[in-house]
């Protein structure tokens, strides 16, 4: 599993540690990734994703996982999230046709 946020795309960055005597050594800046289970109202099950703290705030700001996935173009989503979105659209369309 890569160290990349599924929502924002934040990944590993590189830079330097700089000592008091100005000696530079290479280092990596890792994103604050957490594995989260967000409850989907349409699917009636949790969706597990690896999100950065900023990505989690983005999803919540957009109204939850359902609203986020349905409003985001599929091109901007990861392969796993596209599959979840397809399932959501299928269930939403079936419910709309039944009503």
From Swiss-Prot:
InterPro entries associated with the record: Ribosomal_bL28 (IPR026569), Ribosomal_bL28/bL31-like_sf (IPR034704), Ribosomal_bL28_bact-type (IPR001383), Ribosomal_bL28_sf (IPR037147)
GO molecular function term, any single one: structural constituent of ribosome
Record's keyword annotation contains Ribonucleoprotein: yes
Keyword Endoplasmic reticulum: no
Keyword entries, A-Z: Ribonucleoprotein, Ribosomal protein
Coiled-coil residue windows: none
GO biological process per UniProt: translation
GO annotations of cellular component type: ribonucleoprotein complex; ribosome
Protein origin, superkingdom: Bacteria
Signal peptide bounds: none
PANTHER family associated with the record: 39S RIBOSOMAL PROTEIN L28, MITOCHONDRIAL, LARGE RIBOSOMAL SUBUNIT PROTEIN BL28M
Entry similarity comment: Belongs to the bacterial ribosomal protein bL28 family.
NCBIfam families: L28
Name the record gives this protein: Large ribosomal subunit protein bL28
């Amino acid at each position: 599993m890569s160290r990349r946020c599924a929502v924002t795309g934040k990944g590993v960055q590189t830079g330097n540690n700089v000592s008091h005597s100005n000696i530079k050594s290479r280092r990596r800046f890792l994103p604050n990734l957490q594995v989260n289970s967000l409850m989907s109202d349409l699917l009636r099950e949790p969706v597990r994703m690896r999100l950065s703290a900023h990505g989690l705030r983005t999803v919540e700001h957009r109204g939850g996982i359902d609203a986020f996935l349905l409003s985001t173009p599929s091109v901007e989503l990861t392969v796993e999230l596209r599959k979840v979105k397809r399932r959501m659209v299928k269930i939403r369309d079936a419910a709309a046709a039944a009503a």
